[in-house]
Amino acid sequence: MASSPSNPETAPDGASLAAMTTDQPKKIDPVYYNWSSTFSILLSRMTGSRDVPLEEKYFTEMDALKADTICQRCDSNRDYLLQYSPIVRFLKDEVEKLGGDLNKDNILCRMCTNSQSGGFSLDHGILLCANKFRNRGHQEDTMAHEMVHAWDHLKFKVENDNLRHQACLEIRASTLSGECRFSREFFTKNQWSVTEQLQRCVRRRATLSMMARPGVRDEKHAGEIVNQVWEGCFRDTRPFDEIYR
């Protein structure tokens, strides 16, 4: 991607991309990380006896144990999507028309420590959180989301400290990437409503992203910023003619 002066390496929610990644722990006992242990943790969720800190530690270390395999799968899916995904190929072409270049050298798979599935920096490209993807479709949605961010940064004069600008970016990325389509919300988020489901999903995701940004006080404040720019940003489907999916 083209560089911009002093542009911080930021994720969509304002977090540092470097801070999202993690190194593999030096000592891990692979015997502990087996199907029986995983089943016990899942069973504890059903019985109401969860130990959340223990669960997080367990799954984080299990991811680290399998980091090479997880990142290789992410790399393979990235290469496949760059070649065969209609939405990814379209956005890649549109970014190129604006002088940018997204490819396997600047779309990088890494292990991440937080709940996000990806991040974008105009200077460094796209970060894909390999250990956060449920499947290739989830990775496709994330790539499309970050590629919309890339297009917006090249097309518009985006101010990193302007909360209205950032809210607009999140509204557009969630609307156009496909991550808020009904089938995904129905099967992964248990969102059963059909009427205005897309709008509610986009508002929810944009608000959550804004809550993590410096200068945003709380959920109410984040929602107010999203509402201020909602109409124009939700209806702006560029570079698509309409919402693709």
UniProtKB/Swiss-Prot annotation:
In this chain, a divalent metal cation is annotated as bound at H145, H149
Q: What Gene Ontology cellular component terms go with this record? A: mitochondrial inner membrane
Question: Where does the record place the catalytic residues?
Answer: E146
Return the EC number.
3.4.24.-
Q: Which GO terms describe its biological process?
A: mitochondrial protein processing; mitochondrial proton-transporting ATP synthase complex assembly
For this UniProt record, give its keywords in alphabetical order, as a comma-separated list: Hydrolase, Membrane, Metal-binding, Metalloprotease, Mitochondrion, Mitochondrion inner membrane, Protease
What the protein does comes down to: Has a dual role in the assembly of mitochondrial ATPase. Acts as a protease that removes N-terminal residues of mitochondrial ATPase CF(0) subunit 6 at the intermembrane space side. Also involved in the correct assembly of the membrane-embedded ATPase CF(0) particle, probably mediating association of subunit 6 with the subunit 9 ring.
Q: Which family does it belong to?
A: Belongs to the peptidase M76 family.
The protein depicted here goes by the name: Mitochondrial inner membrane protease ATP23
Species this chain originates from: Phaeosphaeria nodorum (strain SN15 / ATCC MYA-4574 / FGSC 10173) (Glume blotch fungus)
